From Swiss-Prot:
Record-listed S-adenosyl-L-methionine binding positions: 31, 33, 58, 79, 104, 130
Keywords linked to the UniProt accession: Cytoplasm, Methyltransferase, RNA-binding, rRNA processing, S-adenosyl-L-methionine, Transferase
The protein's Enzyme Commission number: 2.1.1.182
Enzyme class label: transferase
Protein name, UniProt field: Ribosomal RNA small subunit methyltransferase A
Source organism: Limosilactobacillus reuteri (strain DSM 20016)
Amino acid sequence: MSNSPEIGSRTRTRAIMEKYGIRTKKSFGQNFLTDLNVLKNIVEAADITANDNVIEIGPGIGALTEQLAQAAGEVLALEIDQDLIPVLKEVLSPYDDVKVINQDVLQANLPELIKKEFKDPSRPIKVVANLPYYITSPILMNLLASPVEWATICVMMQKEVAQRLTAKPGTKQYGALTLAIEYQMQAKIAFDVSRKVFVPAPNVDSAIVVLTPRTNPLPVQPFDKQKLFGFIRGCFAHRRKSLWNNLQSVIGKDPAAKEKMTAVLNQLDISPQIRPEKLTLEQFIELANALHQQNLL
C-alpha cells in the first residue's frame, strides 16, 4: 500500500484535483466529500463486510471507493464523467478488487453488469452512493425497479429528500416517493452530514439513508405495481386539493365514473375530502384495487 494520505482527507483531495487539473462539474452534481470520519461512518452504516459485492454510484475521485475497498469483497464503481476514469484508475491502483467503469447507472443493465463484472456474483450485492441531488429520485426508482435483490442501499442525499423517504402519513414530507420506497424497503436516516465537509460546499446539508428489504410482507397486493404508482403519483399531483379532486383529475369527471368512485370510497370508509397524504400505502393499494374492479383504472 502507498504511504500517501487517504483520498478522503482534504489535503489529498486538493492534491489530486491540482495534479489532474480537476474542476468539479455542476452538470454532474459533483461535490467531493473530504471528511474521513464521515466516509468511514458511511461504510459502517451500509454494514459492508468482506463477503459483500458493492456497487458504488458516482465515485468522484475515489474517496469513498477507497474506504469500501478496505471493507468489501469486491467494489464496482460506476462513474458517468469520462474525465475522472483515468484519475480513479490511478489513485485506486493499490486495490486489486476495485473495478472502475464509465457508466451512467440509469442506462445500465444492472443484472448483466453484476454477472459480468464481479468475480463472484452470488455474494450479497449492496449499493453505496453519494448521489447528485438533482437525480436522486430517478436513480432510487431505477434501483428499485431492477430485478436485482439488493441486500442494502446506502445513499447520501439532500437532507430534505431523506426526510421525504422516511416520512409518516399526515406529514408534509409524505408523498409518492415515500410510498414507492415503503413498498419494497424499510428506510432509516443513519446520520446527517454538514455541507461544510464537501469541496465545493453545496447549498444544503445532507443525510445518509439506509434502505433494507421489507421483513414483513404487505397485507394486500396491488393488481398491478406500475399502475398503482402511476395512480399514487396522480393522487399527489395537487397536494393542497382533496383526494376527491385528485381522483377526478386521474379518472375523469364523467357522472357514471363519479358514481362508481363515490361507491368505492364509501365501501372503503375513506372520506372524499381527505388529503392524499393522510392515506397509508395499504389504503392506496386497496383503493387502486377497488377502482380497478370498477374498470376505472
